[in-house]
Design a protein with these regions (language model features):
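A short, Lys/Arg-rich alpha-helix, primarily the initiator
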Residues: 1-26, 30-31, 62, 71-73
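Residue-level preference for nonpolar/small residues embedded in alpha-helices
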Residues: 10, 56-57
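Short, charged recognition helix plus adjacent turn
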Residues: 76-100
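Short N-terminal micro-motifs specific to bacterial/archaeal maturation
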Residues: 19-20, 37, 55, 66
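DNA major-groove recognition helix of helix-turn-helix/homeodomain DNA-binding modules
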Residues: 57-75, 81
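Recognition helix of helix-turn-helix/homeodomain-like DNA-binding domains
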Residues: 33-56
C-alpha cells in the first residue's frame, strides 16, 4: 500500500475489505453481479481495480459499498486518492522525460 496523508487508494481499500470478509476476487465479482443485476463485472475487473489499473466508476463503487458494507463516501474518497496519485505519477513521468 502507498503511504500518503490522504488514505488508501480505492484498489488497496477494496482488497483489504475483501480479505477481511474472506471473499475471493471471483466471489466478490459474483456478489456484485448478483446485487446489481449487471453481469458486466468479473474477476479480471476486480483484479484491475485492486491493482490500480482501473478506478471503479461511481456505479460500481455504489455496489461495492453495498457488498463490502462500507459507506459510499469512503469509497469515493479512496477513488479520489487513486486518481490524484495516478495524476501525480503521470506528471512526474512527464517531468522525468522532459529532463532527459
Amino acid at each position: 500500500m502507498v503511504d500518503n496523508p490522504f488514505g488508501a487508494p480505492v484498489g488497496d481499500l477494496i482488497r483489504e475489505l475483501r480479505h477481511q470478509r474472506d471473499l475471493t476476487q471471483v466471489s466478490l465479482a459474483e456478489r456484485l453481479a448478483e446485487v446489481s443485476g449487471n453481469d458486466g463485472v468479473n474477476r479480471r475487473q476486480v483484479a484491475r481495480w485492486e491493482r490500480g489499473k482501473r478506478i471503479p466508476s461511481r456505479y460500481w463503487r455504489n455496489w461495492i459499498a453495498v457488498v463490502l458494507e462500507i459507506p459510499g463516501p469512503r469509497l469515493d474518497r479512496a477513488a479520489a486518492v487513486a486518481q490524484f496519485l495516478r495524476s501525480a505519477s503521470e506528471a512526474a513521468d512527464d517531468v522525468e522525460v522532459g529532463a532527459r
